[in-house]
A protein has these predicted regions:
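Catalytic-core regions of core metabolic enzymes
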Residues: 17-20, 27-746
Length: 746
């Protein structure tokens, strides 16, 4: 707990840490006992069971409802693909058709009622899956897939139809994929590829196709879950399941909208505990993208700033393009944990090395200068006039003979080096073929990551197609940008998971004594006055200035004597949001006459503007510091969110803020400050003393507790400015705005 005497609860969200290098057991949620009904103080779940989807992906018996072998009908092509897939996974197919005796020579049953209870998976090739779902429940079928469209993606009527379908599924006890999905779960997965696999989750089948083609580049794929509208099974279910599969090295997701924010975070938490990378394209960065995504699946896209922060908070690697999704997931799936974060660029061309180094440094990668001893060693094989400090320029000729392997081994032998990147911008077989083979051979002998960027636009060269893509130990890229992004994600994810502490482990489960005081202040559907909002802050141990609310000039003079000169006077009322712009704040008042004049002027302005006041605040003047803003808003997907940023009258102009989704701990609160462009102001600039960052962090954590406990009551909170005083002097909320939700619990 941070050292404060304010408040009645701890802000410490300690969690158990997996020892560095320890490999979590993927058969259970690592470190978590899933407890039925275990919720945080806001009523949201803290644990989610891992769904058992083994019989979905590897069923023994598959029923195809609406199977057909009549040429020209859509169901015929689907039935044919299902038969092919079933043959490869060893499943028996039972066609269901009311009038046919056989389909493709396989005996039919006339209805779902005729199934014998051994069916694991039912594929529904029918326009309306609802009546079939109800029949499947009686036959004890465990899983179903509904391809039909016309549900939430079509508007209100479709959304109501999907609600009825979801309710029927919930009653039945089976699990449903879809509706509005496709055949991607039943694709042909190659069994001849080595190494850990990429598991794929998409809400659009076409968008997953580029990642599926990783198999043509030598990368193994294990599963594809096309979730569609997610009436039942959702993206989070598949993340949880894949995070516990031993063959899965990384999870690649294409997400248009999320069904439930908390379930997504719980799934991402399980992946982080098990150190399984999750890489995601999340549509909706722009208004047009969000609108299109919502209409495609009928799900909320969420405020993009919040989605971005939530993903980063739980280690989900967000990328923008499908090519980035493909390359990043492939690298993360197959790379061993880094032994160091130093990156060396090794190239045939000095220009290529310089260009790549600029891009890598700009991305935040560490390119250490090799030691003098290491440079002397490299100059045994590389001419002295070439630079080998990093990047290492070999000039071309050494790679064509025995020296090439010596150079690579010497670089990898440096303990500061964890990644070697070799950009080969164009094929020149006497050099590039030998270089590619030397890199592949070196990758088999080292635990360090070796990456190659093959720059030829042709892509049919033997060194590329056979040598590089034939190796599961070398990460091969086609562009500089994708290589740099993937390597950064690789190093960042390792750092994240090595120090990961799940915030769910120590999230508050029971209300603090502050809640009773706070609820007494709530006014459902109304904005609180500044005075009432500050009382709310005081209930949670957040320091506010000494102040009194008065309704006469004489009372204001008496209050100033009690508060202590100099004072600030402010109009107070529930409809006041921007007092400064209206001239409703007077500062630096030092005498009774100034107090009386200020009172008269404030009330006159309010009367002229038609603003109802509950009085005038006479407030203690607080010393100078760094003005910050700390606030709470409610996101449709994730619930309460906490924001911290640079504050004051220019808060909207500066737009320098970081956001998090509760629960989070002290480490995450400090990370929020590190994201601010103006972070240096807290360290002291131009002679100003360093600010009390510890006090600021504690305010953020106390506001988070308030946001969780008052989730059903508080729609919005804005502390602006929060004056962060010099180190050791604390932080004071000089102004506050609070808006109560309609139908609040109070």
């Amino acid at each position: 707990m941070l050292g404060s005497t304010h408040g009645t609860f701890t802000t410490d969200l300690r969690a158990r840490v997996v020892a560095c290098g320890e490999q979590p057991d993927r058969t259970v949620v690592h470190g978590v006992a899933a407890v039925e009904g275990d919720t945080d103080v806001s009523g949201r779940p803290l644990h989610a069971p891992v769904p058992d989807l083994d019989r979905f992906f590897r069923p023994e018996v598959v029923a195809v409802v609406g199977a057909s072998d009549t040429e020209g009908r859509p169901n015929t092509g689907i039935t044919r693909q299902l038969l092919d897939w079933a043959g490869r996974v060893g499943a028996r197919v039972v066609p269901v058709h009311p009038t046919r005796t056989a389909v493709f020579g396989i005996p039919c049953v006339p209805s779902v009622a005729g199934l014998d209870g051994s069916v694991d998976l039912a594929v529904l090739l029918v326009a309306d899956p609802l009546p079939v779902i109800e029949e499947l429940a009686a036959s004890k079928v465990r899983f179903a897939v509904a391809f039909a469209s016309g549900f939430a993606e079509t508007g209100e009527a479709g959304a109501r139809a999907q609600e009825r379908l979801a309710a029927a599924v919930a009653r039945s006890g089976l699990r449903l994929l879809g509706p509005n999905t496709n055949l991607n779960a039943f694709e042909r997965f190659r069994e001849d590829l080595e190494g850990p696999a990429v598991a794929l989750i998409t809400q659009s089948g076409h968008q997953g196709r580029p990642v599926f083609t990783l198999q043509e580049l030598g990368v193994r794929l294990s599963h594809w879950a096309p979730t569609g509208n997610e009436a039942d099974l959702e993206t989070a279910d598949f993340i949880s399941y894949f995070a516990h599969r031993p063959e899965v090295g990384a999870i690649a997701c294409y997400v248009e909208g999320l069904k439930d924010g908390r379930s997504f975070l719980l799934a991402a938490d399980q992946a982080a505990r098990n150190r399984v990378p999750v890489v995601a394209v999340k549509v909706g960065r722009t208004e047009a993208g969000a609108r299109t995504a919502a209409s495609h699946t009928g799900k909320l896209t969420g405020a993009d700033r919040v989605v971005d922060a939530a993903m980063r908070q739980f280690g989900v690697i967000r990328v923008d393009g499908l090519d980035q999704l493909q390359d990043t997931a492939a690298l993360l799936a197959r790379a061993r944990p880094p032994v160091a974060d130093g990156v060396v660029v090794y190239s045939i061309s000095g220009g290529t090395g310089a260009h790549f180094s600029d891009l890598a440094t700009a991305a935040g990668l560490s390119l250490p200068t090799l030691s003098e001893a290491k440079q002397d060693e490299l100059h045994q094989w590389i001419p002295d006039y070439l630079s080998v400090a990093n990047p290492v320029d070999n000039g071309g000729h050494p790679v064509g003979d025995w020296r090439g392997r010596k150079i690579i081994d010497a670089i990898l032998d440096d303990p500061a080096v964890g990644v070697l990147i070799c950009p080969i911008t164009g094929p020149f077989p006497p050099m590039s073929d030998r270089l590619a083979q030397d890199l592949v051979d070196a990758a088999e002998r080292t635990d360090k990551l070796i990456c190659v960027v093959w720059g030829s636009p042709v892509g049919t060269e033997e060194a590329y197609r056979t040598t590089l893509l034939g190796s599961s130990r070398v990460a091969t890229f086609r562009t500089f940008g994708n290589c740099i992004g993937a390597v950064k994600a690789y190093l960042d994810h390792h750092r994240f998971t090595t120090g990961y502490r799940s915030p769910f482990d120590e999230a508050p489960r029971t209300p603090s004594p502050s809640l009773r005081k706070a609820r007494a202040l709530m006014r459902p559907g109304h904005r609180l006055s500044e005075h009432a909002a500050k009382q709310l802050l005081r209930a949670y141990g957040i320091r506010v200035p000494r102040e009194q609310l008065v309704t006469s000039a004489a009372a204001a003079v008496r209050a100033a004597g009690l508060v202590g000169y100099p004072v600030v006077m402010k109009a107070s009322g529930p409809r006041l949001a921007h007092k400064t712009e209206l001239g409703l704040v007077k500062v630096g008042l030092t005498s009774a006459s100034q107090i009386r004049d200020a009172y008269r002027e404030l009330t006159d302005i309010a009367r002229y503007e038609g603003i109802d006041l509950d009085g005038v605040l006479v407030c203690q003047m607080v010393g100078r510091g760094v003005e910050m803003v700390v606030g709470v808003t409610h996101d449709a997907l994730f619930g309460p969110t906490v924001t911290v940023g640079l504050g004051g009258v220019l808060v909207e102009v500066l737009n320098d803020a970081a956001v998090r989704v509760p629960p989070f701990g002290e480490h995450e609160a400090r990370a929020m400050l590190g994201e601010l462009r103006g972070r240096a102001l807290l360290d002291g600039v131009r002679g100003a003393p360093p600010a009390d960052v510890d006090a600021l962090v504690e305010v953020v954590l106390r506001v988070q507790r308030m946001a969780l406990e008052l989730d059903g009551d508080l729609a919005e909170l804005d502390i602006n400015p929060l004056m962060v005083l010099p180190r050791g002097q604390g932080a004071v909320a000089l102004d506050a705005l609070a808006v109560c939700r309609e139908g609040a619990a109070s």
